Amino acid sequence: MQLPMQLSESARTSKHDVISCWRLGEQIIGGRWYNIFRAAPKTVSPNADHDFVIKVINPELPPDLIALAIDRLGREAHATERIIQSNVIRLLDAELDQAPFFLVQPWVKGRSLDKLLSRAPYLSLSRMLWVLRQTAEGVRAGHENGRVHLGIDPAHVLIGKSGRVSLIGWSQSHLIDEPTWLPQNQLQLARYTAPECFAEDYRAAKASDVYSLGAMIYHVLALRPPFQGQTIQDLEHCHLNEIPEDLIVIQPDCPTRLASLVKQMLIKNPMARPSFREVLNELISIEIEYLSDPTLIRL
C-alpha cells in the first residue's frame, strides 16, 4: 500500500459531518494522533443514538508522521478484526487504503479505568479483581492470536455499565517477535512500558505485556504508576534500574498474594517473570478467593 506523506484538505476528516457510510456526532477525544467521534450509520435518522465511535487521523498531525499514523490505525484494525473475545473491542468497519482513513468500533457505555480511579471515592476489592482479570483475558486473547498489546494502561481499559471490560489501544500492538517502532514521545505509555522495550533491537514479546499489566495493577492499588518520572528518559532509567515501593506499604488492604504477583510481574529480566498464563491463573484464583470479600479500596 502506498502511504501518503500528507493529508489533503479532503482527507482532513475532523471537519466532515459524514465519513463513508457513517454520520459523525460529538467529538469525544482529541489527541495528537487521532480524533474520535461518536457515530451512527448515515442511513438511520439524524436523531438516532450514536452507538458507535469512529477514529480518524488528526488533521493537524505533522506530515512526516502520517504514514506512521496510518500504520498504527491498521494495526488496531487488524488486531480487533482477528481477536474474537468478549474483553477485546471489536472492529466494525475500516478504510486503510485511501483517505479518509478510519476505523469504527462499538461505543462502550461506561468509563475508562483511569477515569474511574480519578472520580470514584472507593472500589470494592472483588470488583477490582474482576476488572483486572477481564483485562488479562483480553491480553491473553491477543497472545493466542500471535499479537502483543504493548499499550496496556488504565486509559485503554473500558468498563461498561454492566462491569464488562473492553480492552482498546491495539494501535501499539505488534506480532510476536516483530521488530517494534514504539513511539518515543508518549510519556503516558512509558509509565507502564517494560524495560526491555527501550532497547533499539527489541522484538515484541509476551513477557513485556506481563510487566505492563503488573505496572497497571500497581497503579490501580497504589493510585499512581510504579515510577513518577517526568520525562521518558527518567522513566526509562527507573524501569531499568529502580525498584518500586512495596504495594503492601502503600495499600495495606491489598491481598498479599496480589502484591506478590505484581512484584514478580515487575521483575526487570523478562525471562524471570511468570508467563502470562501463570499470571492469569493466579488472578483467577485470587478473584475466586475474594469473591465475597466486602473490602473497599479507597481511591
Question: Residue ranges of each PLM-predicted region?
Answer:
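Conserved activation segment of eukaryotic-like protein kinases, specifically the C-terminal portion
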Residues: 183-196
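Conserved short submotifs of the Hanks-type protein kinase catalytic core
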Residues: 98-112, 116
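Activation segment signature within eukaryotic-like protein kinase domains
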Residues: 131-132
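Protein kinase catalytic-loop region centered on the HRD/HxD motif
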Residues: 137-147
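Activation-segment/catalytic-loop signature of the eukaryotic protein kinase fold
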Residues: 94
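Structural helix C-cap motif within protein kinase domains
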Residues: 222-226
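AlphaC helix of the eukaryotic protein kinase fold
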Residues: 63-82
